[in-house]
Amino acid sequence: SDEQINLMAQEIFGTLDPEHPGVSTFTNLGRNIVSGDIQVLSLSYFQADFPDTFRTAAEIRDEITQRGWKKVVAFQTRNPMHRAHEELCRMAMARLDADGVVVHMLLGKLKKGDIPASVRDDCIRKMVELYFPENSVMVTGYGFDMLYAGPREAVLHAVFRQNMGCTHLIVGRDHAGVGDYYGAFDAQI
């Protein structure tokens, strides 16, 4: 029912504002919600378009094991990395005495005006090549459409990273936020 959909949207996004991209998508998906066992039939275009970047959680776990990493920091980005991101990764690695960092970029749908995944991929790889110690960073991506659910989505992102073998997640300013729906540091609390 509309009442149930609205209740779920309010709980997930903290708003029913139809201008919120997550609310808009969620409330326009229809009135049926399906649950049960999941079987992946297709990895969509991600594997074909990003053969050097897209990897499943199992593939990432395997590479982490092959590298011998025990303590692994994850950094998610939907933007090209810049100097502050580099410093965040370095600080987290140093503070935790981590073996490496997984830079995990979003390859799915983002909001209007965001930089295309292929450009982000090139930028991230160049930054890693030029500014990080060799073999300290794994660059990967995953096919997930941003929900823009703020703090709740940050928890979901942490579960994703835990499933792929990471022990820590860097949660930045306005993580999974959009507009003024969430405070800039709500996901860090």
Task: Tell where the protein language model's regions lie, with residue ranges.
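Active-site cores that bind ATP or allylic diphosphates and position pyrophosphate for catalysis
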Residues: 1-189
